[in-house]
Amino acid sequence: MKRQWYILDVIGVGDFLLSQGISQKAIKDIKMKGKILINGKHQTVRYLLQPDDVLTIFYPPENNQLTPVDIPLKIIYEDDYLLVVDKPAGLPSIPTRRHPLNTLANALTYYYQQIHLSSTIHLVNRLDKDTSGLMIVAKYRYIHDRMMKDLGHIDRYYQAHVQGFIENNGTIRLPIYKEPYMMKRVIDSRGQAACTHYWVQNVRRDCTFVRFKLETGRTHQIRVHMASIGHPLVGDSLYGDGLGHFDLDSYRLGFIHPITKQIITITKNRSIE
């Protein structure tokens, strides 16, 4: 990946790169394995930039060790820096001991090979295996670092059917805790702060269609919070009495583009209502 700036003030290369949100580790990688050019000539991070200088950096190639697997991808948005994919339910985001190959990360590795992109897989927001919907994927480590710093400003909206009748909209602010070696999370004061807003969309005889906005991104957050108020997701066997097939879907994302600074809002056309 290449980036270029036109310099306005006197400043050291290292300090300038830090001011652009590039981490010390990334600067070290650029210094050791990439390139730093000032007006087309190689320089070091200690070089003192002058007004009207042109600074160009080249990030070192990233070494992706994952096995490429040809799994169809539904790409909703793509540019030179990132893409947004619509992950189907049942597909793990990353390889695990139980699912070492058939994951979104393996599918992205295959896709990167097809477009000749030398990069590892950088997932900005991660969805559980059984959750479907929109995920942001940074194409480069630098883009991932920038987006993770602004993770709290990424708007994440979900939708699902929950058990029972919910009459009013609401907000759940309850800490979520994970016992060591246990998959299930619980509401516990020892846990991390978590906040979920929810809006009732449609009420049926035995369930309610609800939309959610997350202020935090804890694992199983919506499932834990809704179960805590007596309305687990329909089909959720971990937090309810279902058979393990629920329809939690990430249907909308909003974020500020890390390079262009434009506001990007992506909404899926499909509704599960």
Locations of the language-model features?
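RNA pseudouridine synthases
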Residues: 1-273
